Amino acid sequence: MRLVIAEKPSVAAALAAALGVKNKKDGYMEGGGYLISWCVGHLVELAEAAAYREQYKKWSYDSLPILPQPWQYTVFKDKQKQFKILKDLMRRSDVSEVVNACDAGREGELIFRLVYHAAGCDKPFSRLWISSMEDSAIKKGFAELKPGKDYNALYASALCRAKADWIIGINATRLFSVLHGKTLNVGRVQTPTLKMLADRDAAITSFKKETYHIVRLDVGGAEAASARISDAADAEALKTACEASQAVCISGRGERKNEQPPRLFDLTDLQREANRIYGYTAKQTLDLAQALYEKRLLTYPRTDSQFLTDDMGNTAVHIAALLVGKLPFMKGAAFTPDIARTLDSKKVSDHHAIIPTMELAKADLAALPESERNILTLAGARLLFAAAEPHVFDAVTAVFSCADTEFTAKGKTVLCDGWKELERRYRATLKGKPNAEGDEENELILDVPTFTEGQSFDSPAARVTAHDTQPPKPHTEASLLLAMERAGSADTDPDAERRGLGTPATRAA
């Protein structure tokens, strides 16, 4: 008999359905040579400080630091029934093997191992490692179970993280709370993130607005702008001088540019985009993606990869075809996917990028809750964008001299809309949601004429525009996630496996 332990009941039910296990018991299912049960999140956790010494019940400066040796573990009261069920199942004489089917990631590994050790189990165990809850993926995963020992390092890293969080959280929280006479929570990820927010708030508070002016010349239907001028009188004087002078092109160049499609979503990128477009918090996005994963409509969400493995090409082509037929904004679009640009096994870590699954073929999108449908559509749209052609344009930059001052005209001529055409179609369905962020002052003007060196314009029309410098924007969840992802990058070894503050999943907490 093989005992399969999932992370939660809904996942256990999906595994049972795929394996044909139908006989329901109290806290588990049985049939076809399988026992399938589940944890309820973290069944076994690191014990509270008071478990080590009675004196630790009271927060005091003299009791610090608290450094457990050896570490103790506990099962909280509300989870003891399910833990006992798992423990009894592990000890059944007909159980010869245990399968860790908790989420295929660091925390899932920790959840299983702590239960396994706390139950005193020494039976051999293997690892189910899948990126989709589709029946085909589950069956393939069980046919290719990995030896449990292959994930010993992952377990060690998870346990190290948990102990580090405990030591920092318990000791630093108690220290600062005692010193300041009120509860001040300190955390390994929480506190540096709070510092980012405080720094941004301080920058906004201390910001002093400055007004600047730009003189703009009409040169053959295009507009050439001066550098910033702080004094309004100087700007007006330059305007007057230009209108009595000649604007001469001193350099004009065009450059063919390709703007590559965006990469597929990892969790952090999905959270940022969902926050910017729909206002969802990072946790809401993770919860919605997890729900879609458990409904078999989305691949595993807790990933930091933005590519698919090389062997997923055919599957991705089929999914793209499904999306073209399912997503309303693709109606009438001319689209031939180039899936190859999304494939790179060398850039895939534990799990590939987030994409919809083949279950999309049977799904009634209209029947999904709106928030889940939004996330599924967002992930599907990103797959189509990523597989579309580059956005190709000629960028034109012309510099003019007028009244001993340089003016610059910039523009672009679009040659191939590529993925941006699909993005425009998608955004047109969002009903008032924000467009892509841009810098209004430096935005390229479409179809600027080509200028040649020496070309001149007599007495060009000129105008002065006034602008105010802008304070830093308050962090949104989207910008904060990006700041966390990039935190410390300049000081991190280029060969480091991971950078930034927290993991994609912990940033959602």
Annotate the PLM regions.
Residues 23-27, 125, 148-153, 174-177, ...:
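Active-site phosphate-binding and catalytic loops of NTP-dependent enzymes
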Residues 35, 43-77, 88, 181-290, ...:
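Long, highly charged, low-complexity internal segments
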Residues 11, 107-111, 156, 160, ...:
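Hydrophobic (often cysteine-bearing) scaffold residues that line and stabilize catalytic clefts
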Residues 1-162, 166, 471:
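Intrinsically disordered, low-complexity regulatory segments
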Residues 157-187:
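Amphipathic alpha-helical segments of the small helical/lid subdomains adjacent to P-loop NTPase cores
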Residues 337-367:
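Acidic, turn-prone loop/beta-hairpin segments
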Residues 102, 272, 302:
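Short glycine-centered, acidic/aromatic-flanked micro-motifs in structured strand/loop junctions
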Residues 280-348, 509:
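Extended, well-ordered alpha-helical scaffold/bundle regions in very large, multi-domain proteins
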